[in-house]
Amino acid sequence: VPTAWAAWNKGFPGFFAFNYKLFDKKRRTRFMKMLSLEKELRENAYPGRGIVIGRTPDGKKAVTAYFIMGRSENSRNRVFVEEGEGIRTQAFDPSKLTDPSLIIYAPVRVLGNKTIVTNGDQTDTIYEGMDHQLTFEQSLRSREFEPDAPNYTPRISGILHVENGKFNYAMSILKSNNGCPDSCNRYTFAYENAAAGEGHFIHTYMCDGNPLPSFEGEPKLVEIMDDMDAFTEMLWNSLNEDNKVSLFVRYIDIETGKYESKIVNKNK
């Protein structure tokens, strides 16, 4: 392999060509690979709870999806129901509800032109914080991962901001320090001027396990569909049949702010 000095000895053109190869290699490797969301879900029996946010290929709609899964009877005994402009989890059979903490909450709330999506009651924390002029990230500083040892389930959150024909979004994960509850690791990912056809996917667990391993890395780059019905069907059919519980999908018109939503519940 030629060194930079050897390339320079061959003359400036050789030096430039050598360095361009290095630059081009770095340029090619720095881009995140777009993943198949369908494949990601089909190959993971238990991602836990998941949030998808993105923009349709035609650039006209902001998209979010939220799903919940469960392994225990208590966790599986849930449905999504509409509440105002958002949704709430509810016990399907109240007589079987053993512990409402951590499983009964509002995953989706709307504050003006902002749509908040989370896997816990931090939805309310974000709503109240932003209503008092705090940022998304600042609002979450008072929260940390869930106290469900030994899993210490991460709190995942997302926010969509649609205003004046523009769309930005952000995602957050609060998780234990590699399973140690003494420290909380906080990560926020912001996406300005969201690109058409692209979205990001974050979920609570890397895979099934005991204890359940927390999500690692930044949100995954995934494709988004123009057709809400097709997107909803793909998501629901890709989730593990035994573990899936409920799915929520919303498409928001970026120009008008009007939205359409779909809810799919396994319990009927």
Which positions does each model-derived feature cover?
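Tryptophan (W) side chains
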Residues: 5-8
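Conserved short alpha-helical segments that host acidic/polar catalytic motifs at enzyme active sites
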Residues: 28-268
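Short, Lys/Arg-enriched N-terminal segments with co-localized hydrophobic residues
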Residues: 11-31
